[in-house]
Amino acid sequence: MFTYYFQGLALGAAMILPLGPQNAFVMNQGIRRQYHLMIALLCAVSDLLLICAGIFGGSALLMQSPWLLAIVTWGGVAFLLWYGFGALKTAFSQNLELASAEVMQQGRWKIIITMLAVTWLNPHVYLDTFVVLGSLGGQLAVEPKRWFALGTISASFLWFFGLALLAAWLAPRLRTAKAQRIINIVVGAVMWFIAFQLAKEGVGHILALLN
């Protein structure tokens, strides 16, 4: 059964490693050392729920509801554009230290709400967990399926806590104005690139629904 566990672990790691809104948010909270472990836990728990839903049958709901998929996609586009704009606005702020200080003053609940939006409004999360993991894990028998799910869940917990702790450890070097400017430019550009890719998919969903 450990074979299925490591298959899930490897696949989960491959899907979670690329820079996306979730990773960018966890990294930034780690750099600020602001509720970073709590955010890592909430991200991992969110992944746990999505992974279990995808592998144990929830994928059928998304695949059989094209309108739901279209709504999720365009909601994700809007959120990623907003998130990318915020990062680029901070990067090109004339007083970067003041902009960073304003971000640091965000309350716990605002940070939690942003984290939930970053996770649950990201269509790629549903495609990864419901489509990819759902199609692969759904073919397994009950016991192997549990080990496969445990492997992918382990990848999420290891990655998010590792990323948060590493970012907090490197915080003294990454909190400089130059480093913050570079990080925010990269994050903003990546968010807008993902939004553009999702918009193309969203247009395809709309055209398919109208045909």
UniProtKB/Swiss-Prot annotation:
Record field: catalytic activity: L-arginine(in) = L-arginine(out)
Keywords annotated in UniProt: Amino-acid transport, Cell inner membrane, Cell membrane, Membrane, Transmembrane, Transmembrane helix, Transport
Any one Gene Ontology cellular component term annotated for this protein: plasma membrane
Location within or outside the cell: Cell inner membrane
Primary location group: membrane
One Pfam family per UniProt: LysE
One term of GO molecular function: L-arginine transmembrane transporter activity
UniProt superkingdom: Bacteria
Keyword Cell membrane: yes
Keyword Acetylation: no
Family: Belongs to the LysE/ArgO transporter (TC 2.A.75) family.
Listed name of the protein: Arginine exporter protein ArgO
